[in-house]
């Protein structure tokens, strides 16, 4: 059965579905509280260093600066059985964020000496840096299963302290010591540059590693006050990496590119990101900043930046039916075998105008490339930019091809595209587009239900967004009665729903989208003994679609603290008064299996136990023997068996000059001696060849 073409779904044309009947009871996984990492740990009675850092004795007074505390670019991990199922899925999603924005990768442990063991401990915590202890623990406990929390804890493991502990902290924030819980004042200490390196990156209020303003408070007043008041509600964000987080991480690990990112283009530069026009079409895509019939501005800047804001436009009003304009991306080289193409489309022409997405894939047998149609898009003109995702499965060198095709209908405008992003990630399964969004924030009418969607397994579902609260927006996932219910397993087992409020930044690497995941537990029961995720026709309440069709909706599962209204109005969550919520529901039942446990490789620590490397040298094993790998900089280095000797460019120059002078002096001496000996020998030879004039000969004359 084609899940996307079910008969009862076709006539649901409304984007917002608001039930006129009673809302079923929602289960709030956060208990109505917006708890940060430190609130969770404090509530558990944990007294960890800086709230979520586990220290060993050797680390208490030692720096983590130095290569020996770095992990390899591919980090081995184990997801322990103690982890909740939802946490396992969230951790894997967090790894995808690392791959998209950095060169850091993660792989299941295969016997490597050092690896990260992720388990459900008490609270959320990690050590800082690679402790080289073999199994290094990282806890994702109850209520820690948020993607940015996982990113935060893994940044600790990668070698990062909290942002507000850097040495220049007091230039940017004020610590209100009298408002801090007694005995927790040490969590606000700062550390010198020889303990924690800021990597020459400015102080970052937006860092995912920064405390919130309420951290360790003994009342209701903030413990941290930003010296620039605009950042008061910015610090402590738990959405995603900030730009500076990424800058520091990529510097620390010498990342020159990220793993799964492929391309991004907002057409701000005249070279249009290396895209090329086809010579075999009838028209061209034009780089413009506005079109009389729309759009009036690009999507990147929405007309807010004078002198910038461009997009590509195919004018279908000036060509004949069937005419095409073809724009091809630069050549791209895939590594993973799956990609997601994302872009915005504006149709100001006819609803019969069409955008076709092709892939031109190259091979040794076909150097011109094989053209394959991937997606045909026909859109009713709506007067706004529309977001699209297209799934690709390319394994060879390729180009993405955008073909605009003139339809049979009358056109006064054409097709426009902007903000293209391509990455080797999975596309979301569905997009919930909410127009005229700001009217719902804090309004009694701000309770919205999405259209019905289907998961890849065939489960029907809806999303409930509650914007009516004064300070926070809530989001909940509901199963609803659907066409496949007779063929599905009930209670619904281990389906993870990921709901992402999209940050519409033009570059996917700079987005800080807000994401929350929940997982259906088939064993979860309600107070009356029913299974929470049982068939909606059995446990749900009656509801109505906007066209009057009756269905049943199961209980909601989510959070009332999805995002604050203040954060919702920040960044590019709302753009052109449009909001996009990306939805993915996937089966994660395979994560129930125990990860294969292997025998650890021979310990490097054992082989290096009798080898002491000086000057931050790192002991490594080569050909079964321990040796020191010495530190080096741009103009200095350590050398010797134990890195005990220091060398520098200056020393080398001095040695080179001294050697040159010595050689010159030696050659001069040799030359002078040679000249002296030659002259002496010449005089002796001349003396022996001179005639012997005696007195007798003189008398002969």
UniProtKB/Swiss-Prot annotation:
Top-tier EC class: hydrolase
Main location per the UniProt record: membrane
Membrane topology term: Single-pass type I membrane protein
Residues exposed to the Extracellular side: 23-652
Post-translational modification: Phosphorylated by PKC at multiple sites of its cytoplasmic part. Phosphorylation dcreases activity at the cell surface, leading to diminished substrate cleavage. N-glycosylated; contains high mannose and/or complex biantennary structures.
Listed EC numbers: 3.4.24.63
Expression tissues: The major site of expression is the brush border membrane of small intestinal and kidney epithelial cells.
Cytoplasmic side: 674-701
Signal peptide range in chain numbering: 1-22
UniProt modified residues of type Phosphothreonine: 694
GO CC aspect terms: extracellular region; meprin A complex; plasma membrane
Cofactor: Zn(2+)
Binding residues annotated for Zn(2+), in chain numbering: 152, 156, 162
Entry protein name: Meprin A subunit beta
Organism in which the protein naturally occurs: Homo sapiens
């Amino acid at each position: 059965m084609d899940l996307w073409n079910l008969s009862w779904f076709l006539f649901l044309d409304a984007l917002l579905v608001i039930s006129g009947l009673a809302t079923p009871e929602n289960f709030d996984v956060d208990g109505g509280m917006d708890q940060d990492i430190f609130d969770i740990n404090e509530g558990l009675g944990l007294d960890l260093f800086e709230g979520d850092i586990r220290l060993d004795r050797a680390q208490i007074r030692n720096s983590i600066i130095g290569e020996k505390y770095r992990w390899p670019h591919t980090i081995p991990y184990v997801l322990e059985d103690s982890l909740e199922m939802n946490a396992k899925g969230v951790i894997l999603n967090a790894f995808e964020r690392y791959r998209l924005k950095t060169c850091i990768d993660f792989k299941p442990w295969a016997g490597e000496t050092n690896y990260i063991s992720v388990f459900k401990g008490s609270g959320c915590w990690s050590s800082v840096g690679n402790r080289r202890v073999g199994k290094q623990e990282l806890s994702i406990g109850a209520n820690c299963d948020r993607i940015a929390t996982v990113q935060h804890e893994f940044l600790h493991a990668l070698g990062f302290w909290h942002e507000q502990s850097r040495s220049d902290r007091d230039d940017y924030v004020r610590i209100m010591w009298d408002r801090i819980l007694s005995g927790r004042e040490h969590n606000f200490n700062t550390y010198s540059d020889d303990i924690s390196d800021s990597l020459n990156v400015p102080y970052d209020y937006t860092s995912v590693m920064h405390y919130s303003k309420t951290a360790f408070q003994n009342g209701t007043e903030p413990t941290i006050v930003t010296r620039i008041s605009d950042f008061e509600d910015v610090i402590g964000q738990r959405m995603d990496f900030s730009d500076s987080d990424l800058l520091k991480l990529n510097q620390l690990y010498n990342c020159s590119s990220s793993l799964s990112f492929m391309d991004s283009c907002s057409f701000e530069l005249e070279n249009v990101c290396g895209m090329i026009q086809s010579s075999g079409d009838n028209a061209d895509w034009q780089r413009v900043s506005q079109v009389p019939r729309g759009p009036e501005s690009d999507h990147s800047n929405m007309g807010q930046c004078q002198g910038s804001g461009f997009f590509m436009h195919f004018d279908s009003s000036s060509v004949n039916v069937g005419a095409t304009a073809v724009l091809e991306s630069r050549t791209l080289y895939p590594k993973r075998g799956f990609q997601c193409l994302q872009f915005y489309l504006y149709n100001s022409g006819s609803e019969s105008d069409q955008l076709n997405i092709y892939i031109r894939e190259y091979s040794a047998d076909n150097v011109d490339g094989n053209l394959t149609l991937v997606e045909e898009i026909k859109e009713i003109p709506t007067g706004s930019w529309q977001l699209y995702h297209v799934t690709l499965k390319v394994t060879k060198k390729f180009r993405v091809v955008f073909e605009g095709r003139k339809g049979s209908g009358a056109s006064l405008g054409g097709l426009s595209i902007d903000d293209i992003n391509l990455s080797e990630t999975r596309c979301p399964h569905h997009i919930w587009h909410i127009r005229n969004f700001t009217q719902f924030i804090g309004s009694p009418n701000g309770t919205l239900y999405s259209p019905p969607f289907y998961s890849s397994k065939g489960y029907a579902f809806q999303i409930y967004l509650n914007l009516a609260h004064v300070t926070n927006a809530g989001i909940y996932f509901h199963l609803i009665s659907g066409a496949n219910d007779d063929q599905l397993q009930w209670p619904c087992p281990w389906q993870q729903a990921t709901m992402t409020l999209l940050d519409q930044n033009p570059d996917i690497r700079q987005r800080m989208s807000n994401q929350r995941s929940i997982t259906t537990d088939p064993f979860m029961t309600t107070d009356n003994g029913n299974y929470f995720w049982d068939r909606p026709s059995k446990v749900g309440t009656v509801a109505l679609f906007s066209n009057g069709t009756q269905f049943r909706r199961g209980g909601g599962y989510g959070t009332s603290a999805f995002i604050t209204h203040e954060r919702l109005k920040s960044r590019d969550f709302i753009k052109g008064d449009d909001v996009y919520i990306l939805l993915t529901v996937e089966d994660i039942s395979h994560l129930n299996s125990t990860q294969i446990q292997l025998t650890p490789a021979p310990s490097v620590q054992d082989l290096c136990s009798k080898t002491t490397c000086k000057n931050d040298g790192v002991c490594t094993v080569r050909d079964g023997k321990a040796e020191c790998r010495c530190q080096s900089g741009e103009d200095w280095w350590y050398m010797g068996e134990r890195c005990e000797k220091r060398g520098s460019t200056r020393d080398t120059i001095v040695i080179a000059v001294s050697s040159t002078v010595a050689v010159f002096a030696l050659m001069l001496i040799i030359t002078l001696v040679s000249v002296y000996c030659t002259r002496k020998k010449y005089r002796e030879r001349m003396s022996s060849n001179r005639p012997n004039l005696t007195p007798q000969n003189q008398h002969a004359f």
